[in-house]
């Protein structure tokens, strides 16, 4: 359910795998998973566009090794040393094939780190574009994902505005990690009082509360 608070263990259980990396292409042949963060200490520059429905996700670096001590100085890889596509390459190829009309958009579940041990499920996205751009003296991958309404529905393409990351963090801290109504600490969601499918703009902290499943608004 989009906007719900979730633990790392719960994420892994839901996806039926231990999520050891941020990019996970085609898990179980039904969807992909990415882990994002907009915290000040985040290793990558993920961002939401001003329209509130679009995520620009940065690709991931080469692994740190004895040879590659500073991955931030190297181009992000499209392939591994063996020649197989790396996660960047897999997502990039899927986006290119979608743009060429050769496949449907890749369905991607997005989980966002709000603070240590606290994650939020941002819902289902469609991967619609990918490119490389210069970042100082190296090239990085960028992936464009559109948030879609309708939960996990394969065919829904209506975009839905997201609750911004900074709003979630502010609300979490303001409400003390508990339901604002009853004080429950489990099955929590960020609730702006309106159905997700009818949300027209990104909410602010003034109209978002942390609520348990029992007290959430309809369709939350």
Residue ranges with predicted function:
Residues 34, 108, 125, 143, ...:
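A broad, low-specificity signal marking well-ordered, structured residues that form hydrophobic/aromatic
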Residues 113-158:
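Compact mixed alphabeta submodule
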Residues 182-211:
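Histidine-centered nuclease catalytic patch
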Residues 103-105, 122, 138-140, 185, ...:
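Eukaryote-biased feature marking scaffold/signaling PDZ-domain proteins and nuclear chromatin regulators
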Residues 208-220:
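Short Cys/His-centered divalent metal-binding micro-motifs
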Residues 167, 181-183, 215:
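Extracytoplasmic low-complexity repetitive segments enriched in small/polar residues
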């Amino acid at each position: 359910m989009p906007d719900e608070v979730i633990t790392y263990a719960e994420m892994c259980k839901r996806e039926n795998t231990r999520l050891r990396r941020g990019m996970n292409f085609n898990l179980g042949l039904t969807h992909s998973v990415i882990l994002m963060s907009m915290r000040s200490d985040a290793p990558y520059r993920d961002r939401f566009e001003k329209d509130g429905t679009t995520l620009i996700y940065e690709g991931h670096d080469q692994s740190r090794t004895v040879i590659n001590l500073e991955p931030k100085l190297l181009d992000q890889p499209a392939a591994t040393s063996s020649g197989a596509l790396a996660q960047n390459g897999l997502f990039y190829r899927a986006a290119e094939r979608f743009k060429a009309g050769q496949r449907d958009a890749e369905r991607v579940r997005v989980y966002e780190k709000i603070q240590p041990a606290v994650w939020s499920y941002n819902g289902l996205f469609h991967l619609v574009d990918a490119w490389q751009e210069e970042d100082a003296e190296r090239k990085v991958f960028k992936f464009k994902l559109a948030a879609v309404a309708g939960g996990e529905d394969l065919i829904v393409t209506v975009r839905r505005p997201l609750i911004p990351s900074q709003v979630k963090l502010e609300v979490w801290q303001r409400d003390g990690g508990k339901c604002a109504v009853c004080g429950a600490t489990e099955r929590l969601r960020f609730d702006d009082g309106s159905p997700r499918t009818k949300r027209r703009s990104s909410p602010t902290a003034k109209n978002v509360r942390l609520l348990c499943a029992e007290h959430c608004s309809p369709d939350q």
